Regions:
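Bacterial N-terminal signal peptides that target proteins for export
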Residues: 1-9
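C-terminal motif of bacterial Sec signal peptides marking the signal peptidase cleavage site
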Residues: 16-19
Length: 277
């Protein structure tokens, strides 16, 4: 998610000390067939109602705009904003007063509980569509403190509610980032993104990042032979983030339609694969 996330590491709230790696994931029960050369290393099928699994997820917390002038306050372990019900993770942005702001939402992270170098990250999700909504599936470097954009960012899926049915994929690095208007990005049409579930995925190797919807690749970013770390910082661990922002520099370009709230971002599963040695 395109943002200056200098506060993200200090805002992370770790709610459990048990590592997700203590519970090896089981084989997928639905969705796309995993690549034959990959093995499943991390997953959440959201099959237990309640707050999200604290062995897999933590939260970024706060309401300082997150570098994008966003309007929401991100809460932690609050079921109104993040819960598992009916086999789905629900991230819900709501209009309500909270810590001096008018909206609440949640931003879930796997940092310290799921950090990977290379692999395939796959999320099956249904998006909100109200004007002012800004859901995202993305990764950030797992260093502490975070150095953005030096540590890299992979945007697997972003959708802004005023541009219904269009999803975006991007990468951000020191050389290529939205602050300098040099980011590498692409967009594709998913007309029923808010009416049905789709598989948003990125395949990340030592030389290429390729992002797809339902198996159709629409964005690639290749390592430059002489680019150095400024162009390719993606040889170090990254972690996953799922969130719904309200408004902001991009999501709020055409305002926020309060009549369309709450915004609900539904996630059927998250799966991470890595190549079999």
């Amino acid at each position: 998610m395109t943002s200056l996330l200098l506060h993200a590491a200090s805002a992370a709230l770790l709610l459990a000390a048990v590592s997700c790696h203590d519970n090896p994931p089981t084989a997928p029960s639905s969705g796309q067939t995993p690549p034959a050369t990959y093995r499943l290393v991390w997953s959440d099928d959201f099959d237990r109602d309640g707050v999200p699994d604290a062995t897999r997820w933590s939260y970024d917390v706060g309401g300082h705009g997150w570098g994008n002038n966003e309007l929401q306050f991100y809460t932690a372990a609050r079921r109104e904003n993040a819960r598992v019900e009916g086999g789905h993770l629900v991230i819900e942005a709501r209009r309500e007063p909270w810590e001096g702001l008018s909206y609440t939402s949640a931003r879930l992270i796997t940092k310290g509980k799921g950090d990977w170098t290379y692999g395939r990250i796959e999320v099956r999700a249904q998006l909100p569509a109200g004007r002012g909504s800004w859901p995202a599936i993305w990764t950030l470097g797992s260093t502490t403190p975070l150095r953005w954009p030096d540590d890299g960012e992979i945007d697997i899926m972003e959708h802004v509610g005023f541009d219904h049915g269009v999803v975006h994929a991007s990468v951000h690095t020191r050389r290529y980032n939205h602050v300098d208007a040099t980011q590498r990005t692409a967009r594709t049409s998913v007309p029923d993104a808010a009416a049905g579930f789709h598989v948003y995925a990125t395949e990340w190797t030592a030389d290429r990042i390729a992002t797809s919807v339902d198996g159709r690749v629409y964005f690639t970013f290749d390592r430059e032979p002489q680019g150095g770390r400024a162009a390719w910082p993606f040889d170090a661990p990254q972690h996953l983030l799922l969130n719904v922002a309200v408004g902001g520099d991009w999501g709020g370009q055409q305002g926020v339609d309060d009549a369309t709230l709450p915004y609900r971002f539904l996630v059927d599963y998250v799966r991470v694969y890595q190549r079999t040695p």
